[in-house]
A protein has these predicted regions:
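Glycine-rich phosphate-binding loop and adjoining beta1-alpha1-beta2 segment
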Residues: 220-260
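Internal hydrophobic alpha-helix adjacent to the cofactor/substrate pocket in enzyme cavities
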Residues: 391-410
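Conserved acidic residues
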Residues: 269-271
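A short helix->loop->beta-strand "cap" motif at the edges of active sites that frequently abuts
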Residues: 120-122, 263, 307-309
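N-terminal charged helix/coil linker that caps or initiates catalytic domains
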Residues: 143-194, 415-416, 437, 454-461
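Glycine-rich adenosine-cofactor-binding loop
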Residues: 182-227
Length: 461
């Protein structure tokens, strides 16, 4: 079992569980679920602290609370079909469950399962003074095992894998990476599952970099095939691929296999608007959005919010003057964190543009009719594209990812929520911090699996 929480959840837990008095404290969390054939994932929807003054006992080695404090939490979980997890602190830094913890949980969790009338596993976690989390699953019969991974989608991307997953040697092809970022970061990279949506101009270059940085698994999504017009910017594509109309995902999968660096690839030559594709992306540790479509960006942002996955969106805009000149060249990297601002609230697109893009997808005839009547604004389909510009954007995106898992900048990562680069006017370059939470995306925060999927009827179950 794995667990995901947002950076805001993590900060709230750290503030509550370590108030400065040296005593243990406790909180609970309501969680959505993602149940797949190969894993169970809990995603934190809401953190519910137990007030310090409500606890019966708080010492450096023990905390207890009245059962009445848990009742409203269980009521809410039962009504919404959510899981319940317990999180308490170990101020002394002991990194696993004590005998006292074992006894307390053996008494508490049977009532949790009984109240919620489910046999689906729950979890219990310990937070250490440095903010690290360790935990274990809890089944109805009291058995369980260490959580295989706990991840935090915050300004820094945090991942804690179980001890069994950490013991591995650095292969020869990764030694230069280890010299730059350390053995620990290389081991982390080899355990991550990263989704890349869009495998064309920027996406193919993002994939190339991730594979050569020894990512454990890549989930590639693109419904299109290689055409001759793509050969100027899709790395590893050939004229033979264009003649054969090979799927872009197949071309990149072939290239990664030829590298022989151990990266597993799951490729979908399908549209993002597919439950199977979205389910595969929902259990990724990071998502890269490398597409132009507005409705695709919106859907990926919503998925990232529902399953608490950090999203790095890559954008390129090259405006030609039509006479062989260039008006402006921009590249933009947006790092979108669950529970924070979104591509929508940052103005990457607006609701009118989203509605137009959705209409174009579902009914080209209706789109053309409304466009002709000036009810909607047209969507640009083809833009100028130059591989060197795409490379700069893709490199900035992957560097942003590396900085988030291994902070190396003088300024904190929160400073770089938005990075804009203007090649035609470098003085216009800017970095922006995270903004206010997006009211639209916050509705889906930590919801996990729903019926219909993501609460969208057009996606079905």
């Amino acid at each position: 079992m794995r667990l995901a929480l947002s950076g805001r959840h993590h900060r709230a837990l750290l503030d509550h569980l370590f108030p400065g008095d040296g005593n243990e404290a406790v909180a609970f969390a309501l969680c959505g679920r993602a149940r797949r054939s190969d894993l169970d994932l809990l995603v934190v929807s809401e953190v519910v602290p137990i007030p310090h003054e409500a606890c019966r006992v708080r010492t450096p080695h023990h905390v207890s609370w009245p059962g009445t404090a848990l009742e409203p939490i269980l009521q809410k979980a039962a009504a919404a079909g959510l899981a319940v997890i317990k999180i308490h602190s170990h101020p002394g830094g002991y990194p696993w469950f004590s005998d006292t913890d074992d006894i307390a949980e053996a008494e508490m969790f049977p009532s949790v399962f009984g109240w919620l009338d489910t046999d689906a596993p729950m979890a219990s976690l310990i937070m250490l003074p440095d903010g690290k989390l360790v935990g274990r699953s809890v089944r109805e019969d009291g058995s369980g095992e260490p959580l295989s991974c706990i991840r935090v989608a915050g300004d820094d991307f945090l991942y804690w894998h179980s001890q069994a997953a950490e013991a591995a040697t650095v292969p020869e092809h990764a030694r230069r990476i280890a010299q730059s970022f350390g053995d620990g970061t290389v081991q982390l990279l080899r355990q991550l599952r990263i989704g890349v949506v869009g495998c064309s101009g920027t996406g193919s270059i993002v994939v190339e970099q991730l594979a050569r940085n020894c990512i454990g698994e890549l989930v590639l999504v693109d419904s299109d095939h290689v055409e001759h017009k793509n050969l100027n910017r899709i790395v590893n594509s050939t004229a033979d691929d264009a003649d054969a109309e090979r799927p872009k995902t197949e071309v990149l999968q072939r290239a990664i296999a030829a590298m022989g660096l151990g990266t597993k690839v799951t490729a979908f030559n399908r549209d993002l608007m597919s439950v199977e594709v979205l389910q595969a992306l929902s259990t990724c540790d990071v998502l890269f959005g490398c597409m132009d479509s507005i409705d695709g960006r919106h859907l990926l942002n919503k998925l990232a919010s529902a399953y608490l996955v950090p999203l790095i969106d890559v954008g390129v805009r090259l405006d030609a003057d039509g006479a062989g000149g260039i008006d402006s060249i921009w590249t933009v990297v947006n790092t979108v964190l669950p529970g924070g601002s979104s591509l929508l609230s940052r103005g990457v697109y607006d609701m009118a543009a989203l509605e137009a893009a959705s209409l174009r997808r579902t009914s080209q005839a209706a789109y053309d009719e409304q466009l002709k009547a000036s009810y909607i604004k047209g969507i640009k389909v083809d833009r100028p594209a130059v591989i060197s510009v795409n490379m700069q954007a893709a490199a900035a995106a992957v560097d942003e990812f590396l900085a988030r898992i291994h902070p190396y900048r003088v300024m904190p990562n929160k400073t770089f929520a938005i990075r804009r680069f203007c090649l035609t006017d470098p003085d216009a370059n800017e970095n922006k911090e995270e903004g206010s939470a997006c009211s639209v995306m916050s509705r889906s925060l930590g919801t996990g699996d729903q019926m219909p999927f993501l609460g969208m009827p057009n996606l079905g179950d």
